[in-house]
Amino acid sequence: MTTVDTQHDDMIHDAILDYYGKRLATCSSDQTIKVFSIENNQQTLLETLRGHSGPVWQLGWAHPKFGTILASASYDGHVIVWRETGGVWSELMDHTAHQASVNAVSWAPHEYGALLACASSDGKVSVLEFKDDGSCDTRIFTAHEPGCNAVCWSPPSLSGSVVGQSPAAGPKKLATAGCDNLVKIWAFDAGVNNWILEDTLAGHVDWTRDVAWAPSVGLTKTYLASASQDKNVFIWTKEGDGPWQKTPLTEEKFPDIAWRVSWSLSGNILAVSCGDNKVYLFKESQNKWQLLNELSN
């Protein structure tokens, strides 16, 4: 385990490695983003990005095929897309369509193109599509009236791709988590050129804080995890065109709010970040989820 001294002056809200695992970006209530080189257990601060006027909640690296690009979501209602060229960082775009805190950003799988989804406390989700000519199309829709806390993309194939084969991109889908206690599934409809509600997943009894779609490599069904202020994590599964099935991750509630959920790259291990300052790792075995480990400071 490597410890990184971020030198932030306030609480850290997100830390994310790039595609190659060699750069770490962190963000904080001090309104800054820091980018580090992480190699051979050595950390080097490469840049401190300043542009937000409020806490920065979440970050997202774009796929490297689009360049060295980082998106940041802030309480100030802005999403800033940063680009590094020749070692110099600059603002590529300042997205100002939202009327309240932007709580989450998520880049689409690269098979879908350079697409960025943003979730806001104004209840809306915006999807930015960056074009090769430098232009950007924006679509915005109301996802959760009381506020939207998280957004994630479906993997490029939802049918359980065969290992070794390149999955078809398939239809574009999003999952969102909101202050209405719901998880919603959205599909892009080219006919109306916007996002259409496909499914509503009810089960939590307090705000849903995060949602994460499992990678589909080698899996025979679709897995989706949701984390909630009600101290529960649910696993939602779907086979083919069948209905979504809900399974509690644990028999007992977590000791505190379940803030974040994250799948391993292979989709077989789920990490849960909890308000008790621990990260819990789970793996499915014989249709039951078993605790593998607890990580704490």
From Swiss-Prot:
WD repeats: 7-46, 51-92, 97-138, 143-196, 203-246, 253-292
GO biological process entries: COPII-coated vesicle budding; mRNA transport; positive regulation of TOR signaling; protein exit from endoplasmic reticulum; protein import into nucleus
Membrane topology annotation: Peripheral membrane protein
GO MF terms, alphabetically ordered: structural molecule activity
PROSITE patterns the UniProt entry points to: WD_REPEATS_2 (PS50082), WD_REPEATS_REGION (PS50294)
PTM annotation (Phosphoserine): residues: S29
Alphabetical UniProt keywords: Cytoplasmic vesicle, Endoplasmic reticulum, ER-Golgi transport, Membrane, mRNA transport, Nuclear pore complex, Nucleus, Phosphoprotein, Protein transport, Repeat, Translocation, Transport, WD repeat
Gene Ontology CC annotation, any one: cytoplasm
Record carries keyword Amino-acid biosynthesis: no
Localization of this protein: Cytoplasmic vesicle, COPII-coated vesicle membrane; Endoplasmic reticulum membrane; Nucleus, Nuclear pore complex
Subunit: The COPII coat is composed of at least 5 proteins: the sec23/24 complex, the sec13/31 complex, and the protein sar1. Component of the nuclear pore complex (NPC). NPC constitutes the exclusive means of nucleocytoplasmic transport. NPCs allow the passive diffusion of ions and small molecules and the active, nuclear transport receptor-mediated bidirectional transport of macromolecules such as proteins, RNAs, ribonucleoparticles (RNPs), and ribosomal subunits across the nuclear envelope. Due to its 8-fold rotational symmetry, all subunits are present with 8 copies or multiples thereof.
Role this protein plays: Component of the coat protein complex II (COPII) which promotes the formation of transport vesicles from the endoplasmic reticulum (ER). The coat has two main functions, the physical deformation of the endoplasmic reticulum membrane into vesicles and the selection of cargo molecules. It also functions as a component of the nuclear pore complex (NPC). NPC components, collectively referred to as nucleoporins (NUPs), can play the role of both NPC structural components and of docking or interaction partners for transiently associated nuclear transport factors.
Family: Belongs to the WD repeat SEC13 family.
Protein name: Protein transport protein sec13
